[in-house]
Structures are given as structure tokens and as C-alpha cells.
Amino acid sequence: MMTTLTARPEAITFDPQQSALIVVDMQNAYATPGGYLDLAGFDVSTTRPVIANIQTAVTAARAAGMLIIWFQNGWDEQYVEAGGPGSPNFHKSNALKTMRKQPQLQGKLLAKGSWDYQLVDELVPQPGDIVLPKPRYSGFFNTPLDSILRSRGIRHLVFTGIATNVCVESTLRDGFFLEYFGVVLEDATHQAGPEFAQKAALFNIETFFGWVSDVETFCDALSPTSFARIA
């Protein structure tokens, strides 16, 4: 059953049962003091409301029959998956750079199995959800995301998570190039860097690549009364 989500720059209509809510990298690394972003000098002090808003969005999406996909960014303990000096990721990843500056952190930042890699305690995948590791910013790079979505007839993606201006935007952009309709819930995301990075990412998304809405509006669009209005 179709519903219409109020968004910028215009409303978008979609079928929740042929859509997915994507939770990007809600790991201790990105959302918890003592995690990678915090240790690398980024401000994570305002991530708690984002976690709560994602909980709300996930609950509403699951009740409406949407597929929930959780991403975890990171690599093996030896960081082979991160790429060596021949990879730009080796030079640009702030996690890798932080570990080179502070060798005592080696094997602790974004390493699979570590506390840093784990999802925050408040966000727990449920049976029927899909949890995917990813080795780069985009959730489409070297993951089965595209085939998972296409095999289910899913064309609409609703994004939450951290960081808006890095992994969220990268995944939404790649989805745009693959003909997916991407919506980001702005109050269920958080930037890496100053506030202007959040504003710039949202501007790019709503102007060039997708749509921007918020959690309350999203939940309202998934309510039974909204489906009744469309019908």
C-alpha cells in the first residue's frame, strides 16, 4: 500500500513493503565517547538524540513491513581489507591515520570483533533484519546490497546514521546512480565535522540526489491513517 512522505524539495510516494530503512554505521566508533571519531578529534557529544530518533524510525519502519538494513564499517584485525599504500583509503581514512599517529590504538579502531566496531547498545538488529559489513564509505561498494534490494523489488531507500557527509551521503549517491530513490531523515543523522558539513550534505542531497525529511514526518507517513488517506 502506497504512502506519501512530506519531504524537501517535494513529497515522495512509496510502498513501505517495497522499501528499506538503512541504518549506516551506528557503531561505538562513530557515536560513543572513546570511539574512533572521538579519538580522532571529532565531536560526538550530540549523538544521543540521533540514536533515540533512529530507534523510533526503526520501530515504525519494522511495523510497516519495511526491510531494515544495518551497516557496520570496518576491516579485519590486520586491516588487509582497508587497503595498503596503493589505496587512497589508506591515506584518507582518519581511523587509519589516527592509528599510525597512535600505534597503541592499532587493532582497536574499526577492527571486526572490537568494541569500536560494535553497534551501540541501544540499537539491536532483530530477526529478519540484514546486517552488512562494508569496507569503504559507500554501502554499495564490495557488498551485496544492490542484489539484496533488487531481488526484493526494493527501489526506495530511507537513510539514517553517521556520518551524514561521509558514509550516508556516499551510499545515497551511489544508490542514485543505480536508480534508487533515496530519502535521508535529517534528525536521525549526524555529521563528522562542523555543523556546516551537515547542512552542506543535506543541501547536496535535496538539490541533486534525493529527498530530505525527518523522523516524526516519516512515522506519520507510516501510520494507518496515512495509508487510509492514500487509499
From Swiss-Prot:
Enzyme class: hydrolase
Single annotated GO MF: hydrolase activity, acting on carbon-nitrogen (but not peptide) bonds, in linear amides
UniProt xrefs under InterPro entries: Isochorismatase-like_dom (IPR000868), Isochorismatase-like_hydrls (IPR050272), Isochorismatase-like_sf (IPR036380), RutB (IPR019916)
Keyword Hydrolase recorded: yes
Catalytic residues (positions): 25 (proton acceptor), 134, 167 (nucleophile)
Induction: Up-regulated by the nitrogen regulatory protein C (NtrC also called GlnG) and repressed by RutR.
EC number(s) given by UniProt: 3.5.1.110
PANTHER family: ISOCHORISMATASE-LIKE DOMAIN-CONTAINING PROTEIN, PEROXYUREIDOACRYLATE/UREIDOACRYLATE AMIDOHYDROLASE-RELATED
Record-given protein name: Ureidoacrylate amidohydrolase RutB
Species annotation: Escherichia coli O9:H4 (strain HS)
